[in-house]
Amino acid sequence: MTYDHIVIRYGEMSTKGKNRLRFVRCLKRNIAKKLKHFPNLQIEASRDRMYIRLHDTPPHPVIEKLQEVFGIQSLSLALKTESDLQKIKEATLFFVKQFPYEGKTFKISARRADKQFPITTNELNYELGSYVLKNTTGLTVDVHHPDIDVRVEVRKEGTYITAYDVPGAGGLPVGTSGKAMLMLSGGIDSPVAGYLAMKRGLQIEAVHFFSPPFTSERAKQKVIDLAQRLTEFGGTIRLHIVPFTELQQAIYKQVPENYSLIAMRRAMLRITDEIRKKENGLAIVTGESLGQVASQTLESMVVVNDVTTTPILRPLVSMDKTEIIAIAERIGTHHISIRPYEDCCTIFTPKAPKTKPKKEKIIQYEKFLPLDEMIAQTVARVETITLKPNEPLDELF
């Protein structure tokens, strides 16, 4: 006997009622893409569980990949046997013996998804527990706080035995909540915002504002690397690189310095919204955290938002910087974000940006610029790169 399956448990998907089948199909598709480099695996989906038949594939690399797939609450290594009482007893004993069990406590937690199984759940718990005790030494029962909790799930197609959970990424399968555009800078915050947006089922496309020669090719590459890392959680991502130099310089020439940052943010949002329309997105995601910097006061957000009616999603709005950094380190974007290359938001930062801007004033200042024409020209020159998981970056160019 050996572990031959991985059992996947759904999270919030279990509450989706009539839409559950759509969520399960999407999760299965995302898992299949994530595990495409393991050709021997077989994925079997049911209403409340998903099972991966290993076919002798080493399980731990598979589990590591699955932990990056949104929509999975937890997963476990499992042994599948026939739904025959003696077979279940033997498999349960084998499972317990995989642990250093002497001096430990255990519990049997049986569940009969197949109600035609000939004995009750309580009887099954008793039969299995007794069999384990008779065939081991130094093992005792503790039904409240066991060291080993052996779970036995009897189903029509067979019985699955598991003993410990590996936490999943949680959330909803990417693609079940529509598409949004992520405003992706080279900083710490926006990749985390993209990660959290994908966790809620959003498919994302990234928009980055590039201002050569003030920002370097290495700064551009940093953003490509960040987007590439995010593909490991959400699959293929299209990265739209916006040539922003001309428009940015015009803003800083014509708009008073203390309003220049607000004017720039409004222009960036308008451009992102135009790209969203072309790509059939439903929302825009930003890495803003309330009060973190001058452009992220509530008054500034209101004035910037005024240029669009598109929903602006801010997953980090109530987080402290330390919380954001902790997530960035956990998901593998922090070490990329801290590379010392400036982005367009930092090269022309005013000395005293307005923290409580007036909408009437910024509208008046914008009249000195042919903004509609410049935005249209900028959108027409956007460069788009398609990034896929597990793809070496040198193959993109």
Swiss-Prot record:
* A GO CC term assigned to this protein in UniProt: cytosol
Q: What is the lineage of its organism?
A: Bacteria, Bacillati, Bacillota, Bacilli, Bacillales
Its subcellular locations are: Cytoplasm
Task: Give one Pfam family, short name only.
Answer: ThiI_fer
This chain belongs to which protein, by name?
Probable tRNA sulfurtransferase
HAMAP family reported for this sequence:
ThiI (MF_00021)
The record, for Gene3D superfamilies, names: 3.30.2130.30, HUPs
The reply to whether Nucleotide-binding figures as a keyword in the UniProt entry is: yes
Q: Look up the record and give one Gene Ontology term from the biological process aspect.
A: thiamine diphosphate biosynthetic process
